[in-house]
Amino acid sequence: MCMIYNTSEIHFQQATTLTPEQFVAGLTDFGSGRSNLFGNSTDEYLNVYHLGSFEADVTEGSHGIWERLHYDWSVPNHVALTTTDSNVWGGLSGYTYTFTHQPNGTTHIDVFIVREGKNFKGRLLGLVLRTIGKGVLRRVFENSVQAIEARNLAKLSKVDLLVSKSAEKSS
């Protein structure tokens, strides 16, 4: 009998120019176009059941894999995503993001991902994640950080433009 170990634990770290609040704002933006920030979350699967000030219950996914997640960002510099339902993940599956302000003004993001397969497909995906899939997930994470940074810069540019136009009208 062949057994596939069903839990994968993956850990990434990255520095960003974003503040923790800016990253959390991107992470918890469940509007259309979420896939522009998170490649593994398409509008087709996105369903927001509850969105509060510091928590949300959301289903998201892509390519035939979905999960319902409980987002909790009530603790400063920390966001926990707990899988409450999925077609492949169960058990202790989820994500934990921890943010640390750096003296140079950047933020250190530490993300810990747990994937516990609840069926054969989930266990097989977990095996892939532990081996060749870790690099893919790292790139997806890095792309998300870069997309949120770009979105933040675009917002700042719009604010600068509005302030500039307002100053011109006042003169």
Predicted regions located by residue number:
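Short structured motifs
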Residues: E9-I10, F54-E55, A80-T82, S93-T98
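Hydrophobic ligand-binding cavity/cleft-lining segments
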Residues: M1-S53, S171
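Beta-strand/loop substructures that line and gate deep hydrophobic ligand-binding cavities in soluble
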Residues: T84-E142
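Glycine-rich portal/gate segments that line the openings of hydrophobic small-molecule binding cavities
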Residues: S35, T42-V88, N143, A147, ...
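Charge-rich (especially acidic), low-complexity segments
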Residues: L156-S171
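Short, surface-exposed coil-to-beta transition loops
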Residues: T7-H11, G64-L69, G90-T96
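A short, structured loop/turn motif at beta-sheet edges
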Residues: T16-E21, L51, D72-P76, T98-H108
